[in-house]
Amino acid sequence: MPERVIGILGGMGPLATADLFRRIVEKTPAKRDQDHPRIIIYNNPKIPDRTAFILGNGPDPRPELITSARKLEECGADFIIMPCNTAHFFAGTIQSSVIYPLVSMIEETAKRIEEMGLRKVGLLATDGTIKGMVYHRALLKRGIHIAVPNKKDQGLVMKAIYEGVKAGNLELGRELLLKVAKKLERRSEGIIAGCTEVSVVLKPGDLTVPLIDPMDVIAERAVKLALGVEDF
């Protein structure tokens, strides 16, 4: 199969976008520069907050998402990935606006969890991802149940994401997320790092159950698609 150009629809947020690029580079079996896949990144931090819109108190991010996807297509991307879990609430709209495939981080993660044989997983994610049933739809159709934090702990997750990682305070983000994750792992067989900011600060060795990181999952899939090892 021919090699493909990866398109990254980024900016949600910029740190998560840079983190995904790094992971793709690290997961590529390269011995020289020329062995790496071509990657086009459109980093658009002007995309309105996805969670705010889903909760009914923010502007619509779809116009900027569609514009960004089309720019990647114009630049020659063969497929698109998004380092933002909540943005996958709009995956259908984005896909219908372009010809090339949108490879869903959510679906790829759900497949990985199914392959692991897990039947109940905890979810650390934004209010928008939870309310929008972004992971629920992908997992429940596979018979996998989801545990989410209680209202108080979910507030800590949102604080960790917005006042911690997105604001550049990684230490605060990590501290709050670990606190919630430790509670959630007691009633789960694994924990999904269901927000790219969570992926930035939590690592597999932090918990006694597996930490399923969608950023790793999509990075691995993107490399295989780009190098022609796998097909869509």
Curated annotation (Swiss-Prot):
Species name: Thermococcus sp. (strain KS-8)
The protein, known as: Aspartate racemase
Sequence similarity: Belongs to the aspartate/glutamate racemases family.
Annotated InterPro entries: Asp/Glu/hydantoin_racemase, Asp/Glu_race, Asp_race
GO MF annotation terms: aspartate racemase activity
Pfam families assigned: Asp_Glu_race
Residues annotated to bind substrate: 49-51, 85-87, 166
Swiss-Prot/TrEMBL keywords: Isomerase
Catalytic activity: L-aspartate = D-aspartate
Its EC number(s): 5.1.1.13
PANTHER family: ASPARTATE-GLUTAMATE RACEMASE FAMILY (PTHR21198:SF7), GLUTAMATE RACEMASE (PTHR21198)
Keyword Electron transport: no
Active-site annotation: 84 (proton donor/acceptor), 195 (proton donor/acceptor)
